[in-house]
């Protein structure tokens, strides 16, 4: 049996990307955003095809993503933030709940979400990861937006094939 293969597609032309950035740990989050926006531009996503909103912290990110997803105006979304471990259990709570919320929104609304919420032990670790993570999120958002379109077309072709089979009967 011969199997098909879908090449990853990093062409961002015409894609609409929504970005939700947490403001807590703002210098780190600003670096994430700058790297993400620069990479989106390199991939062909126009500035007017992006919408950036900011929220207080990582726990507020999922709700903003949900509202963007509900609008149906975005091909992909990006979550940006930084959770730095402190001396209390709060780190685990924020890390786990923000991640679970982001995943749930993507699955509930069938929209790709690149999760760029850094979870690190120190500010130095966060700063060391901002450029690469911001860039990677842009690439993941574009690639997954294109993949969803390609996979949705499989469903459309499957429906057409089923109709053709019914017509043949």
UniProtKB/Swiss-Prot annotation:
Write out the GO cellular component annotations.
cytosol; riboflavin synthase complex
Q: Which UniProt keywords apply?
A: Riboflavin biosynthesis, Transferase
Q: Does the keyword Transferase apply?
A: yes
User: Which pathway features in its UniProt record?
Assistant: Cofactor biosynthesis; riboflavin biosynthesis; riboflavin from 2-hydroxy-3-oxobutyl phosphate and 5-amino-6-(D-ribitylamino)uracil: step 1/2
UniProt record, GO biological process: riboflavin biosynthetic process
Classification via InterPro entries: LS (IPR034964), LS/RS (IPR002180), LS/RS_sf (IPR036467)
MF (Gene Ontology): 6,7-dimethyl-8-ribityllumazine synthase activity
Under Enzyme Commission nomenclature, its number is 2.5.1.78
Residues given in the record as (2S)-2-hydroxy-3-oxobutyl phosphate binding sites: 87-88, 129
Query: Which transformation does this protein catalyse, written as a reaction?
Result: (2S)-2-hydroxy-3-oxobutyl phosphate + 5-amino-6-(D-ribitylamino)uracil = 6,7-dimethyl-8-(1-D-ribityl)lumazine + phosphate + 2 H2O + H(+)
Locate the residues binding 5-amino-6-(D-ribitylamino)uracil. Answer: 24, 58-60, 82-84, 115
Q: Which residues form the active site?
A: 90 (proton donor)
**Top-rank taxon, per record:** Bacteria
Which top EC class is named for this enzyme in its record?
transferase
The record describes the protein's role as:
Catalyzes the formation of 6,7-dimethyl-8-ribityllumazine by condensation of 5-amino-6-(D-ribitylamino)uracil with 3,4-dihydroxy-2-butanone 4-phosphate. This is the penultimate step in the biosynthesis of riboflavin.
Q: Which family does it belong to?
A: Belongs to the DMRL synthase family.
- What is this protein identified as? 6,7-dimethyl-8-ribityllumazine synthase
Source organism:
Cupriavidus metallidurans (strain ATCC 43123 / DSM 2839 / NBRC 102507 / CH34)
């Amino acid at each position: 049996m011969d199997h098909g293969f879908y090449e990853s597609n990093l062409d961002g032309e015409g894609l609409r990307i929504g970005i939700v950035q947490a403001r807590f740990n703002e210098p780190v989050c600003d670096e994430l955003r700058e790297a993400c926006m620069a990479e989106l531009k390199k991939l062909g996503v126009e500035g007017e095809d992006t919408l950036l909103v900011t929220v207080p912290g990582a726990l507020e990110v999922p709700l903003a993503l949900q509202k963007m997803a509900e609008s149906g105006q975005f091909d992909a979304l990006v979550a940006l933030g930084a959770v730095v471990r402190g001396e209390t259990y709060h780190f685990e709570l924020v890390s786990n709940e923000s991640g679970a919320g982001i995943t749930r929104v993507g699955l509930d609304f069938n929209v790709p979400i690149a999760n760029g919420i850094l979870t690190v032990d120190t500010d130095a670790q966060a700063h060391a990861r901002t450029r690469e993570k911001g860039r990677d999120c842009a690439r993941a958002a574009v690639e997954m937006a294109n993949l969803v379109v390609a996979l949705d077309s499989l469903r459309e072709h499957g429906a057409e094939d089923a109709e053709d089979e019914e017509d043949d009967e």
